[in-house]
């Protein structure tokens, strides 16, 4: 079959081409913000519009276009949706076996204040899970935990998405940084160092921001010591580990340092006023729970599903385990690779997005054993045995999990179908090239490219795979550091995570807000844009004023 070459400027004018390319994204924003459509409806129509743009404007062959949609949809089911199914199942086991009341009580014994619970669960525990697993699992698990602690579901999901900004760049054992190094040929250690000189500023701002969203200026004034302990210890550990150890461990190290510092600090200090959301009858439940005293053994047993989850996910993420399933590894036969018909190596990515014309691979990987979701399922099975849950109850719980998640899973599939048609048609690259045409102002717009990549794909890793080499090329054209621009793609990407349709579908699924995706999108969108502008300002200062900060 003939190789179809991507054309990034079909209109002959990059601004006009990018306007047409942005139609599906503009529709998606409009559908959620103004029309208030349900997530799966908005995603389905977005795929239809993206297909129309790919076929009519980019002249993509019909078979390639349809193949990319199907490939994206299946990628949404596995590995993405599989992670959510397993994560929600672990949470439900904890609730069904009655252990969740003890977890709640143990957190309440550290602090009954929901602003500080947000720091412990949403920030510290969430950052740890991001470092180990990434790909949506942290938001699903922490948001569900917070709803169990009496948080309003919309706030739990929205706040977890926003606070997840801090750890995303080093998520899943530093994969976004390692991928950026692979696609650009730059040293991933240096990219990690640069990200570690941008993100710590954002981390502390984000935590104060979260306090302000929850409880206004009063909340900031009352909680600033705890925020400085949690955010300050995290930021310092993030800087040191990324600059002196490497990009794999900053999240794991920083989150553990922050969790220990914050817990010890809260043993000595509590805010003058205890803040709780005044709804869902949460406070009545909590008084009785807080009065119940549990032994250390009971508390450890109650947390066991999440301890198992932490252990299995960490094991699955370590390089020796991953190497078993890599080409040439002892268990490589366990990974099923299927080249996507009508698509694999039939589309060519062209300069300036890549250095030379490159056939775009499309291989569907069914890693039934080495997927993160399977690691979480193992944690669920260990929990069932350890907590002596009846097999019939466990099967029923798994069934109800699947039933509840059916629509969100469809949404995630459609969102990834849109991401893949955008990538294979060249639509996403047109938008990227338009941003790269902004000349010396590109240092400010560079993070928006990462933001766009994560919005489209739901992953900082995928955003770097798409746009990191373009960032490096643009940097050389305007005479600034390529390491800085590639790092800005990664750091800007983290701010897009909170509005990425994939993240929103996952968060809504975890807290039972299916069909309310538009509410969650409206909750996070302004914060996302403000943070991206902040990263743009930091990057521009580092490019032209604070050049000594570049490694």
Curated annotation (Swiss-Prot):
Domain of life (superkingdom): Bacteria
Keyword field contains Membrane: yes
Coiled coil: none
Catalytic activity from the UniProt record: (S)-lactate(in) + H(+)(in) = (S)-lactate(out) + H(+)(out); (R)-lactate(in) + H(+)(in) = (R)-lactate(out) + H(+)(out); glycolate(in) + H(+)(in) = glycolate(out) + H(+)(out)
Major subcellular location class: membrane
rRNA-binding among keywords: no
GO (cellular component) term, any one: plasma membrane
Keywords: Cell inner membrane, Cell membrane, Membrane, Symport, Transmembrane, Transmembrane helix, Transport
Membrane topology annotation: Multi-pass membrane protein
Protein family (similarity comment): Belongs to the lactate permease family.
Function recorded in the entry: Uptake of L-lactate across the membrane. Can also transport D-lactate and glycolate. Seems to be driven by a proton motive force.
PANTHER family on file: GLYCOLATE PERMEASE GLCA-RELATED (PTHR30003:SF0), L-LACTATE PERMEASE (PTHR30003)
Protein name listed in UniProt: L-lactate permease
Gene name of this polypeptide: lldP
